[in-house]
Amino acid sequence: MSEHAVSIDVREIMRCLPHRYPFLLVDRVTEMEPNVRIKALKNVTINEPFFVGHFEQYPVMPGVLIIEALAQAAGILAIKSQGERLENELYFFVGIDNARFKRQVVPGDQLVFEVTQMTVKRGIGKYAARALVDGQVACEAEIMCARREV
């Protein structure tokens, strides 16, 4: 077990992120090193609402939702690195570079998100992010999130 093992459950995640069903895409955080990295997961089930139309006969998780889940994990890392989310602030997904999809994600898979902080300047963080299934990379990208007062 990692020295940075934590167990942040969905209730605590909901205190960090404003997302709610059906758009909350992180179920649990299993490791975190503030200002460095986070490891989180999502259990993908046939009950996900997007499987109704993507695709009925061959359900595949949309790649953009995997990217969104990685951005949510990056947001949790950013928020937990500063302590807690302030009531009047949100973290917005503002950019993506070098996105690649390498494996389909289907019902029954467990997505493991590994996000590493690259830089933070003027409230904008850049993160190297990977989503894995059974140790295989399903998606990788560099993601940018910005902290904004609302």
From Swiss-Prot:
Gene3D superfamilies for this protein: Hotdog Thioesterase (3.10.129.10)
Q: Name one GO cellular component term.
A: cytoplasm
Give the active-site positions: 54
Q: Which GO terms describe its biological process?
A: fatty acid biosynthetic process; lipid A biosynthetic process
Per the UniProt entry, the Enzyme Commission number(s) are 4.2.1.59
User: What molecular function terms (GO) are annotated for this protein?
Assistant: (3R)-hydroxyacyl-[acyl-carrier-protein] dehydratase activity
Q: Which reaction does it catalyse?
A: a (3R)-hydroxyacyl-[ACP] = a (2E)-enoyl-[ACP] + H2O
**Keyword set, alphabetical order:** Cytoplasm, Lipid A biosynthesis, Lipid biosynthesis, Lipid metabolism, Lyase
Alphabetical list of InterPro entries matching this protein? FabA_FabZ, FabZ, HotDog_dom_sf
**Where is it located?**
Cytoplasm
Briefly, what is this protein's role?
Answer: Involved in unsaturated fatty acids biosynthesis. Catalyzes the dehydration of short chain beta-hydroxyacyl-ACPs and long chain saturated and unsaturated beta-hydroxyacyl-ACPs.
Please give the HAMAP family that the UniProt record associates with this protein.
FabZ
Q: Which family does it belong to?
A: Belongs to the thioester dehydratase family. FabZ subfamily.
NCBIfam families named among the record's database cross-references: fabZ (TIGR01750), PRK00006.1 (NF000582)
Stated name of the protein? 3-hydroxyacyl-[acyl-carrier-protein] dehydratase FabZ
Taxonomy-wise, where does this protein's organism fall, top ranks first? Bacteria, Pseudomonadati, Pseudomonadota, Betaproteobacteria, Neisseriales
Gene name on record? fabZ
